[in-house]
From Swiss-Prot:
Gene: ihfB
CDD domains assigned to the protein according to its UniProt record, in alphabetical order: IHF_B
Name assigned to this protein: Integration host factor subunit beta
Entry keyword set: DNA recombination, DNA-binding, Transcription, Transcription regulation, Translation regulation
Function noted in UniProt: This protein is one of the two subunits of integration host factor, a specific DNA-binding protein that functions in genetic recombination as well as in transcriptional and translational control.
Subunit note: Heterodimer of an alpha and a beta chain.
GO cellular component, one term: cytosol
Any single Pfam family the record assigns to this protein: Bac_DNA_binding
Composition-biased stretches (Basic and acidic residues): 72-86
Xref: PROSITE patterns: HISTONE_LIKE (PS00045)
Similarity-based family: Belongs to the bacterial histone-like protein family.
Spans annotated as Disordered: 59-86
């Protein structure tokens, strides 16, 4: 599902809310989440999961085109850990 598909589905469910307002709400929610992670803070949505940053240590990589080894710097990467309810739901029979 893409962001635009999510906006469309939510706008269909909440017909009393203009589609543009749904779009603005989704974009603002994602922006707030990005800013929170950028500050190094954790986001927890009970029943859904949590977002945090994990540190990837510096390592030696390889350029796939040339085969040459390359030093890669350490960096923080976003990490999502699903909550118990979400894990249980995805293990139920999949909806077609």
């Amino acid at each position: 599902m893409t962001k635009s598909e999510l906006i469309e589905r939510l706008a269909d469910k909440a017909r009393h809310v203009p589609s543009r307002d749904v779009e603005l709400a989704i974009k603002e929610m994602l922006e707030q989440m990005a800013q929170t992670l950028q500050k190094g803070e954790r986001i927890e949505i009970r029943g859904f999961g949590s977002f945090s940053l994990h540190y990837r240590a510096p390592r030696v990589g390889r350029n796939p085109k040339t085969g040459e080894t390359v030093e890669l710097d350490g960096k923080h990467v976003p990490h999502f850990k699903p909550g118990k309810e979400l894990r249980e739901r995805v293990n139920e029979d999949l909806i077609a």
